[in-house]
A protein has these predicted regions:
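Conserved alpha-helical "signature site"
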Residues: 2-3, 116-301, 305, 310, ...
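Two-component/phosphorelay signaling modules centered on CheY-like receiver
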Residues: 17-37
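Active-site residues of response regulator receiver
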Residues: 57-62, 90
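Alpha4 helix (beta4-alpha4-beta5 surface) of REC/receiver domains from two-component response regulators
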Residues: 70, 93-108
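A Lys-centered signature of the CheY-like receiver
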Residues: 111-112
Length: 418
């Protein structure tokens, strides 16, 4: 067990919340008992250091205020012995920028996008003695809160949904084998609501926002870059309770994941048939039950912290009560683009006024995905959304089945309608 009296104090200063969260997870992975502080600007860092020096500073070059380089200069002016370890993360890798930093002796000068595995090893080398291993106890539920109390408080701080097991295993393998080929992983990412949602959120953050919003995974990866996208994904894989391991929760998770993927596939198929935005419809379909998945992850966290065993009825009641509020809170807190949030909302109900084609598509796709297996979707032809889209019973009856290539099916259907 780690000795909390010697647990290192690590200060992270990065204006981008997603990058800061990645750094937090890497520090926790390297040293599970570290005391962490995350600060948004250089003034906060200086004020914090005046009250007590950390054992390590990890600072972004573009930190608001005097900036990362000047902050390093100010830290070195204090002439502490030994010098405070200082990792400077920067996009400036030109010779002049490197020469400007060298006299200030940064412990590490890390170019963006940095290699997460390399940074993790640097952190271990700095924060652990050679051969040292730590085992940190899992905290318990404060005062043994009831599940309802825990879920009510966790809604505004929830990290989101669990990862699909196949995605988590692939990310673990990539980190352990030092393989960083996003092209191999991206098809898996497209199936995972949590990864898709967080990469889109990161791509639309203030630090990344350039012009139009990103509303699909491909757009997000193009803006973030493959290496930073993979870093953020690996950071997610390091988070606590990111797997559903409770046998009672797994069937619920599998059902909801399948519902998300089925809605996404049908929405894209219909959009391709009707000349809508297929990838945007796919994204909204994949994310429409993000809140339900986040509730399951919070229940898993509650169980990991020592919460009592539950019944299936209790889990179902928690999903009914908290699924929609969790989803709304997450989409707002992640600052997903308003247009994407409105499209996700259309899965549940069509508001007043003019309906966009994509909104109608998503609404009918969700209804079709909820039909029991083997039930004919032709019955949906009478629905308002189907009538407004001009969908007849014949087309609805030809909706692709689970596991069928929706793209190939849509192409052939579109040809027959031409």
């Amino acid at each position: 067990m780690a000795d909390m009296e010697r647990a290192p104090k690590v200060l992270i200063a990065d204006p981008d919340r997603w990058s800061a969260e990645l750094l937090v997870e890497l520090v926790r992975k390297a040293r599970c008992d570290a005391h962490l502080e995350v600060l948004p600007d250089s003034q906060s860092v200086l004020e914090h250091c005046r009250t007590g020096w950390p054992d390590l500073l990890i600072v972004d070059y573009g930190l608001p205020g005097i900036g990362g380089l000047e902050l390093l200069r100010e830290v070195r002016r204090q002439r502490r012995h030994p010098p405070v370890p200082f990792f400077l993360i920067t996009e400036r890798v030109d010779a002049a920028s490197v020469r400007a930093a060298l006299p200030l002796a940064p412990t590490a000068y890390l170019a963006k996008p940095f290699n997460a595995e390399d940074l993790l090893q640097r952190l271990r080398n700095l924060l652990l003695e050679p051969g040292e291993e730590l085992a940190c106890p899992v905290p318990s539920v404060p005062n043994m809160q009831s599940l309802e109390e825990y879920l009510g408080k966790a809604r505004e701080t929830s990290s989101g949904a669990p990862l699909l097991k196949v995605v988590h295993e692939a990310l673990d393998h990539a980190m352990q084998s030092h393989k960083r080929d996003l092209a191999e992983l991206q098809p898996l990412f497209l199936q995972d609501p949590q990864l898709t949602g967080q990469l889109i959120a990161a791509a639309n953050s203030a630090g990344q926002h350039l012009g139009n919003s990103c509303q699909t995974l491909d757009q997000a990866v193009a803006r973030l870059g493959s290496q930073h996208s993979l870093n953020l994904a690996q950071g997610l894989a390091l988070q606590r309770s990111v797997d559903l391991t409770d046998p009672l929760l797994l069937p619920h998770g599998e059902r909801i994941w399948q519902q998300c993927q089925r809605t996404a596939e049908l929405a894209r198929w219909l959009a391709q048939c009707l000349e809508g935005d297929g990838e945007r419809c796919y994204t909204a379909g994949l994310l429409h039950l993000l809140g339900d998945l986040a509730v399951l992850r919070s229940i898993q966290s509650w169980r990991d912290l020592g919460g009592e065993e539950l019944t299936a009825e209790q889990v179902e009641e928690a999903l009914r009560t908290h699924g929609a509020p969790y989803g709304s809170a997450l989409r707002t807190r992640w600052r997903l683009p308003l247009e994407l949030r409105q499209l996700i909302a259309a899965a549940y109900q069509l508001g007043g006024g003019v309906y966009s084609k994509d909104a109608l598509i998503l609404h009918i796709a969700k209804l079709a995905a909820e039909l029991p297996e083997g039930e004919d979707a032709a019955q949906l032809a009478k629905h308002k959304a189907a009538r407004m889209l001009g969908l007849d019973a014949t087309l609805l009856a030809s909706l692709p089945k689970l596991g069928m290539s929706t793209q190939a099916s849509a192409s052939s259907t579109k040809s027959s309608r031409s």
